Amino acid sequence: MIVTYGTVGCPVSRGGSPGCGRRIAEELRLAEDARLRLALLGRCIVKGSPAQARGELRAELKAIDATIELRKELDAIDAEWAPKIELSAELRAIDAEWRPAIRLRSAYRAIIGRIELRKELDAIDAEWAPKIELSAELKAIDAEWRPAIRLRSAYRAIIGRWELSKELKAIDAEWRPAIARESLRKELDAIDAEWQHAITFWHISRAIIGSIELSKELKAIDAKWKYVAIYERQKAQRRREERAAKAREELRKELNDIDAKWKSASAIKLRKDLRSTSEGVDHTEFALELRATDKSGNMELVLKLKATDTKNQHDAIVKAIEDGFVGYAAECGAATRELNACGGMSTTSAPSTDLISTVVSAVTTGTGQQQSAGSESQRPTECGGGGTLLSSLFALILPSSNWYCNAVLYGGFLGCLGS
């Protein structure tokens, strides 16, 4: 077992004696440690190997050298601090010699302080003596008047409570209607909530009874005015029928007059030609319709041409119709001028008069175009190549709003093509 010891410095006090005591204790400890180390070293030498013993011996020698050096340092410190240690011993002796005098001086100072404090307190008491006496008198007065003061406080409390009670009563009187209204409102709300179903049923029953009574009154009124309403409707119906009959009669008279004027020899000849052409062609039908309405006075002319024999006879039929229209257009123009000169078409406006001349020019132009086209154009199977000419003619005639002019033309067509 190897034990290593290190050097430890000795703390030395600069005051003298405390440091010397610690140094002596340190030396004693070091001597005891050296003795123990030597004893341990002897046991190690006896029990251990020579090499181990030499190592431990070397370590012990180093420790002894360190102890010797420490001893030298401590001796130097002791030599340095020896005068101070001696001075400290002298000062302690002086302190021990003067300690009774120091105690006496401290007691003297305490006595002097108490005497001065007593003087100051006596001066303060002399200054405050009147105030203290006055305070004693006031305390005596307070003790004497304490029952009266208590009575006064109780009286003030009673007066305050009385005034507060008055104010509260005034506030209650002011707010009593509002409080009563609020209470009444709550009671009424509770009653309404309780009787809500009954009130709803009552309203429904009143509504049903009212509707029944109203229905009875309306039925009575209807029964009272029933015949009056029927009479008024019949009267209005008769008036409308009379106006319609009068209008139809007037229209019939005017149309008869127009038919009587326009049944000329040329119209009869054209009609006969068309009939002969129609009779010579099988499966061909012609129809001319004249329709008149009472509301706007417009008249509609419908020319129906149906040709089922499309091989040879169609062109001849269309050509005959176009020739007849060309001749009849000239007749219409002359008749229109004659009527204008005689005043027979005084209600005819200028656009309608221009319409007749436009029809004449359209028929003439269409005929020329058909003749120049010749056999180059392929004609359709129904309504033929004259469909364009006829469509142009009826498009110019039919939309006219002046029924007098249309009646002139329609009467002429009826005279030419009618049965």
UniProtKB/Swiss-Prot annotation:
Single Gene Ontology BP annotation: biological process involved in interaction with host
Signal sequence region: 1-39
UniProt keyword list: Coiled coil, Secreted, Signal
Location of the protein in the cell: Secreted
One example GO MF annotation: actin filament binding
Predominant localisation class: secreted
Gene Ontology CC, one term: symbiont-containing vacuole
Coiled-coil ranges per UniProt: 232-262
The protein's role, per its UniProt record: Associates with actin filament appendages that are formed in the inclusion appendages of the parasitophorous vacuole during infection of the host erythrocyte.
Name of this protein: Appendage-associated protein
Source organism: Anaplasma marginale (strain St. Maries)
